[in-house]
Amino acid sequence: MWVKFYSFAIVIEKEPEDPGYFAYSPTLPGCFSNGATIEATRSNMREAIQQHVESLLARGEPVPQSEDVVHVEELTLGLPA
């Protein structure tokens, strides 16, 4: 049995008002998850992406790829206050 591998960029952010983290994939609109720790959020997001992709495939829809996202980094800017 052949296996096809997919890669997706994910973004993990600190919840603004609650303890924990929130994750989403810019490539898969509507696919998101959360968790108490970064590790739990990453694991939960992996499951959410798997379910999302399986749903797309079951409906015969194309699976978007992260080809447009080639690099992610955080920038810090100093601006006059």
Where are these regions (language model features)?
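Short, charged, surface-exposed hinge/linker loops at domain edges
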Residues: M1-A9, S43-A81
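Prokaryotic Sec-type signal peptides and long signal-anchor helices
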Residues: A9-I12, A36
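Short aromatic-glycine-(Arg/Gly/Cys) micro-motifs in beta-strand/loop hairpins
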Residues: I12-L28
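A generic structural signal for ordered secondary structure
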Residues: F22-Y24, F32, I49, L77-G78
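Hydrophobic residues in alpha-helical membrane-spanning segments
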Residues: T27-G30, Q65
